[in-house]
Structures are given as structure tokens and as C-alpha cells.
């Protein structure tokens, strides 16, 4: 039972933060009824009083900060109430039944989705991590607010990671970079993704982080006048053309630089988009007009013009990217997008969140399509290690953009093959594929696809997948579908062989399998610790 002094200290600190939260919510969504939020605050205050975090702060500060992040996303009162309650089941005596009774089914469903399964239920930490992620992703499908709370929770935990011992910092940072940063990326939430990744990099590789930070900071100071000059030139040209736009400059985030240096084996001086300018226009037409203007001023780098407006990324990110070479030979990236596109790039699925009767917008459904696919692909993966490794591939693939003959875009992992393409179209197309044409030319099934390839799959009825395909495919969908098919057909073959062996042995004792009742066969299987006669036959076969 907390002392009176502890209760007073907790109340004094948290009341101020709660008032800030309410002000933010009133500002963002003035017509919302905040009664459920106030009730959730009082409930959390009651049950978390006396608890402290590793920083020494009252524990309730954490749910309040999570709620503040959600308020910054302009989330609804139900989401923010769930944010205030998100640790109550995990860290207090409160149960989901209590939450449901006090706050209703919606809040209870969300809180249950973000609550970790007890560690007691698992043999290893890896198994616990895999099952908790699987649970969260299944809950996300029903209510995206589950993952938005989880991201807000992880963001505040990363912001306060300094208070934990180094070994825990490393584990949490690694999981953040492998799972939560990529999830934010997949949902188009660039702002949160960037902060999560930089914080993860800082704690996972503190020496590498500091070295890169010092190099980039030196470049930033050297480049301040250069950036001002570039902005001034663009503003002047836009004014001459009668285009109203916002022009700002930025330096690429540290983790993004780090990944590029690793992937391309280059130095910081060779990073084309270390410095970048962002031009935010009022209309789509102005985006393309601005692109023409900057190409008239500076020479574009061949192969560095990317039109993500005409062909959005899978997370629906839209922008024009171009790299140019300035008069003094400095490479420089310019991103051009509308205000609406910029909001979507920064906030992603949270940008237009309008929750109504449990439904999301068509655009948000498109964003969540990848999640539904991932859950489907992982359904048959029981091994925790395999689940985690394939999930990481699915969350953060290096993507290539290919096309069907009818022009439909098919996004695949880098170095994907026609087999991957076939399985992405349909499972049966994958199972029966015998060949492929890429850009009108016959290619082997091991052929590596590239962005822009037009792929036609050739199929043959009755054809079956080959085990050799597992060493060729790159997508987890293809790998899991092939494994699933092989497992089913291997089992069928094993049952057939086992049945023949049992019949042969039984005949020695003048016993005929066809005369045995199902209960007799089940009893024999049970004696060997097996659930069904087919399990017995498969084991023998």
C-alpha cells in the first residue's frame, strides 16, 4: 500500500501532465467527449500509485507520455484511454475483465492486444517474443489502434532507455530496429520510424553512432551556407514561375546514413542524399513544374529521378525525388510533394485516422494489406526462430517493383525470382509454374527479377513444387507455401507407406486392418502417445 507522501507526489506530478494531455486533445479534436479519458486517468492513478520506473519517476508518467504521443497523432478518446491503461493488466492486479467492466469492449480489446503474454508460458525468451508479436499482429488486423499504442509505448521507452542497464538497452534497441521501426515504416509513419531507428542505433552501437554523428555534424556546419544558398536559389526560381511553395532543407537521419554506408560500401562523402531539400507545393501539377525548374537550374544525376507519385511505395508514400549536381560539384537531393503527401509521409496511417464503427478507410486498408498477407504467410510457421527471421524479412524487404502483363504492380524482395512472382499472384499459380517470360524473353526460374520487369508465368496443370525451389526463392510467402505443400504431401505418402507396413505385419497374426474398428486403431495410437490412427501410420511410414 503506497504511503500518503507517495500518493501526494504521484498526484502532483501527474496532474500537470494530464492537464497538458487534455489541452492537446481539446485543441486537436474540440468536439470529442473526454469523459472516458478522465476516467482512465483516475483508474491508472489508483492502480499505478506507489510504482516507479527505472528513472525513479512515478510509473504513471509513462502511460501519460504514451497518451501524449497518441494525442499528437490526433487519436480518438478510446485510443487515448487505452493508452493510459495499456500497462494496467501487465503490471498491476487489474484484469481484462476489470477493464471490460469499467470501460467497455472496445477499450478492453485494445488493452488485451497490447498486453504481453506471461513469460511463465514459454521455455525461451525467443518463443515469448515470437508469440507476443504474433498476438499483437493478429490484434492489429481487428483494430489498428493496437499497434499505434504499441509504437507510442516503444517510442517513450526508447526515449528513456538511458536508465536501464546496458544489456537490456541492447536487447530493446535490437528489437526496435528489427521489428518496431519496420512496422512504423510499413504503416508510412516516417516521423516515428526515424526517431525509433536513430534511438535504436544509438543504444545498439554507441561507438558507431557517435563516430557517425560527429562526421555528419561537421558536414552540417560546413554545409549551412550551402543549404541557405540552395534554398534561396529555389525560392527565387519559384517566385519567377508564380509557384507558391514551402522550401526547407534537412540532413539525412543517422540510421539511414549508416544503413546506406553498410549496403553500398561507400563513404559519407559519396551519399547523394546526405543534404536534401524538401519542396512542399499546393498542387500535384506544381510538383512536376518544380521538378522541371530544378532540372533547368542544376544537372540531374542519371538514374536518380524517382516518381513515387505515379508509383507510390507499398506504404503509400508519394513524392518526387531527384538528385542534382550543383555548380561546385556537390551532389544534392530534392524531394517534391504536396502538403497532403507530406502529412502522409510523416504520419502515415495516423494522418487521416477516422475511426467509425470499427472500420478504416480504403486507403488505410491498402496499407494494412501487407499485414494481412504476413499473418496468412506465418500461420503455418510454428518454430519461433523461423517465425522471427521470416517476419523481419517481411517487415523490411529491399523491394523491387515488377509488373504483370496487364500492368498490375507486384512488389517483391530484392533478388526475387519468377517463382516468388508466381506465388505472389496465387498459390496455385506458384505450385503449377513451369517457366517464365521476362520482358517477352524466356528465362529460367532461378532468374533474378529487377524493377520494371514485366513477368508472365507459364503454368502446367498437375505440376508440383520442387524442394529445390526452397534454395531459390526470396519471399517468405513462396517459402512457406512450398514448405506447406511438401509437408502435406510427405505426410500423405508417409501415411500410405505406414498403412501398408501395418497391414503386412498384422497379416502375420491373421489380423486384417479393414476389419478393425476406428476405436481399436485410436486405442493403439493412444498407447504410443499419438492422437489419431493417421499419426501412427505417418510415424511408421
Regions inferred by a protein language model and the residue ranges of each:
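Metal-dependent phosphohydrolase cores
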Residues: 1-142
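Internal insertion modules embedded within essential enzymes
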Residues: 8-18, 92, 96, 104-107, ...
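Short hydrophobic/aromatic beta-strand micro-patches
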Residues: 280-282
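Solvent-exposed beta-hairpin/edge-strand motifs
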Residues: 295
Amino acid at each position: 500500500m503506497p504511503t500518503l507522501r507517495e500518493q501526494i507526489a504521484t498526484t502532483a506530478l501527474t496532474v500537470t501532465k494530464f492537464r497538458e494531455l487534455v489541452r492537446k486533445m481539446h485543441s486537436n479534436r474540440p468536439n470529442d467527449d473526454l469523459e472516458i479519458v478522465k476516467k482512465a486517468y483516475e483508474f491508472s492513478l489508483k492502480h499505478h500509485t506507489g510504482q516507479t520506473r527505472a528513472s525513479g519517476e512515478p510509473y504513471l508518467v509513462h502511460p501519460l507520455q504514451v497518451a501524449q504521443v497518441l494525442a499528437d497523432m490526433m487519436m480518438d478518446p478510446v485510443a487515448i484511454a487505452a493508452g493510459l491503461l495499456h500497462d494496467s493488466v501487465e503490471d498491476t492486479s487489474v484484469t481484462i475483465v476489470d477493464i471490460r467492466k469499467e470501460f467497455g469492449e472496445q477499450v478492453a480489446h485494445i488493452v488485451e492486444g497490447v498486453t504481453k503474454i506471461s513469460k511463465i508460458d514459454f521455455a525461451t525468451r525467443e518463443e515469448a517474443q515470437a508469440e507476443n508479436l504474433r498476438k499483437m499482429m493478429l490484434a492489429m488486423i481487428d483494430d489498428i489502434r493496437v499497434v499505434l499504442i504499441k509504437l507510442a509505448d516503444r517510442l517513450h521507452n526508447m526515449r528513456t532507455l538511458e536508465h536501464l542497464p546496458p544489456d537490456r538497452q541492447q536487447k530493446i534497441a535490437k528489437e526496435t530496429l528489427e521489428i518496431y521501426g519496420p512496422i512504423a515504416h510499413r504503416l508510412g509513419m516516417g516521423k516515428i520510424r526515424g526517431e525509433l531507428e536513430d534511438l535504436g542505433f544509438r543504444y545498439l552501437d554507441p561507438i558507431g553512432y557517435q563516430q557517425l554523428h560527429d562526421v555528419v555534424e561537421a558536414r552540417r556546419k560546413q554545409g549551412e551556407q550551402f543549404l541557405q544558398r540552395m534554398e534561396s536559389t529555389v525560392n527565387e526560381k519559384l517566385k519567377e514561375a508564380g509557384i507558391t511553395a514551402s522550401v526547407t532543407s534537412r540532413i539525412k537521419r543517422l540510421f539511414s546514413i549508416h544503413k546506406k554506408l553498410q549496403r553500398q560500401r561507400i563513404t559519407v562523402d559519396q551519399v547523394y542524399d546526405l543534404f536534401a531539400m524538401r519542396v512542399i507545393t499546393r498542387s500535384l501539377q506544381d510538383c512536376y513544374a518544380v521538378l522541371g525548374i530544378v532540372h533547368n537550374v542544376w544537372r540531374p544525376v542519371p538514374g536518380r529521378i524517382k516518381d513515387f507519385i505515379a508509383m507510390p511505395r507499398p506504404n503509400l508514400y508519394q513524392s518526387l525525388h531527384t538528385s542534382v549536381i550543383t555548380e561546385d560539384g556537390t551532389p544534392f537531393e530534392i524531394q517534391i510533394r504536396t502538403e497532403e503527401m507530406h502529412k502522409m509521409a510523416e504520419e502515415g496511417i495516423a494522418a487521416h485516422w477516422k475511426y467509425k464503427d470499427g472500420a478504416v478507410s480504403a486507403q488505410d486498408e491498402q496499407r494494412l494489406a501487407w499485414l494481412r498477407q504476413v499473418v496468412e504467410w506465418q500461420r503455418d510457421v510454428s518454430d519461433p526462430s523461423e517465425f522471427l527471421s521470416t517476419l523481419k524479412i517481411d517487415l523490411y524487404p529491399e523491394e523491387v517493383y515488377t509488373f504483370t502483363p496487364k500492368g498490375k504492380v507486384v512488389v517483391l524482395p530484392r533478388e526475387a525470382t519468377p517463382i516468388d512472382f508466381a506465388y505472389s499472384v496465387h498459390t496455385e499459380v506458384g505450385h503449377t509454374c513451369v517457366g517464365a517470360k521476362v520482358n517477352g524473353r524466356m528465362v529460367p526460374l532461378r532468374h533474378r527479377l529487377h524493377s520494371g520487369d514485366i513477368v508472365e508465368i507459364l503454368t502446367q496443370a498437375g505440376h508440383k513444387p520442387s524442394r529445390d525451389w526452397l534454395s531459390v526463392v526470396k519471399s517468405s510467402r513462396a517459402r512457406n507455401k512450398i514448405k506447406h505443400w511438401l509437408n502435406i504431401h510427405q505426410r500423405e505418402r508417409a501415411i500410405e507407406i505406414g498403412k501398408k507396413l501395418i497391414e503386412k505385419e498384422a497379416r502375420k497374426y491373421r489380423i486384417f486392418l479393414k476389419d478393425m474398428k476406428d476405436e481399436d486403431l485410436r486405442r493403439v495410437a493412444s498407447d504410443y502417445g499419438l492422437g489419431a490412427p493417421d499419426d501412427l501410420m505417418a510415424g511408421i511410414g
